[in-house]
C-alpha cells in the first residue's frame, strides 16, 4: 500500500530562532478541502487546523538550531530539519513529497520536490500548518523572555520594528549571526 508523506519548512527568512519542518502522513478520513498553505490561513484557524491534522494523521516535527543555521547555512539547515522530521515519523512512507526544489539527503527514501507543493498537495499543506504553528508557539515563548523586539508580532522577521529594536537593544543568542542585516550589527547582548 502506498503511503505518502508531505514535508514543508517554516522560518527560513526569519532573523531569529530555529528553522522548523514537519512531515505528515494524512489519514484517509481527513477533509483535504480544509488544507491550505499556512501562509493563507488566519492564525486562529491555523491553530485549530493544526490540532485537527495532528488527530487525523501521523506527523512529526524537526528543527535545526540557530547554531546549525549559522554553521551550515539556512538551506542546509532547512534540509536537516526536514530530514529530522521524516526520520521521526512513526511509519516509514513509501513516497515523500517536499515543498520546494530541493530534497534532503536520505538514503532508502523515495523523495520528490514539488515547487509550490504547499499550495497543491494536501499533505504538504498540512505539514506547512503544523510546522508554522509549532514554530510560532516557540517564538512566542522566546518573546516573553526577550522583551522589546516584538517577536510575538513579527516572529523574528526583519520588520522596521524588529530592526529598530536591534539598533536599541543589540543582537542576542537567538539571532542568526550570519544573516544580513544581523551580521552588520555589533553584538551587545551575547
Question: Where would I find each of the regions flagged by the language model?
Answer:
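RNase H-like, Mg2+-dependent phosphodiesterase core
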Residues: 1-190
Amino acid at each position: 500500500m502506498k503511503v505518502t508523506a508531505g514535508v514543508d519548512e517554516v522560518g527560513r527568512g526569519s532573523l531569529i530562532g530555529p528553522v522548523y519542518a514537519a512531515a505528515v502522513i494524512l489519514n484517509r478520513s481527513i477533509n483535504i478541502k480544509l488544507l491550505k498553505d499556512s501562509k493563507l490561513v488566519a492564525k486562529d484557524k491555523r491553530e485549530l487546523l493544526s490540532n485537527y491534522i495532528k488527530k487525523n494523521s501521523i506527523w512529526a516535527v524537526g528543527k535545526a538550531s540557530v547554531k546549525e543555521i549559522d554553521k551550515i547555512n539556512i538551506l542546509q539547515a532547512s534540509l536537516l530539519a526536514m530530514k529530522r522530521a521524516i526520520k521521526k515519523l512513526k511509519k516509514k512512507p513509501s513516497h515523500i513529497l517536499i515543498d520546494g526544489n530541493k530534497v534532503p539527503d536520505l538514503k532508502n527514501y523515495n523523495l520528490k520536490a514539488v515547487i509550490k507543493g504547499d499550495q497543491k498537495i494536501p499533505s504538504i499543506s498540512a505539514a506547512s500548518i503544523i510546522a508554522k504553528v509549532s514554530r510560532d508557539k516557540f517564538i512566542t515563548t522566546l518573546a516573553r523572555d526577550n522583551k522589546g523586539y516584538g517577536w510575538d508580532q513579527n516572529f523574528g522577521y526583519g520588520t522596521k520594528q524588529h530592526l529598530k529594536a536591534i539598533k536599541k537593544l543589540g543582537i542576542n543568542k537567538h539571532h542568526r549571526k550570519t544573516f544580513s542585516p544581523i551580521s552588520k550589527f555589533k553584538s551587545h547582548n551575547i
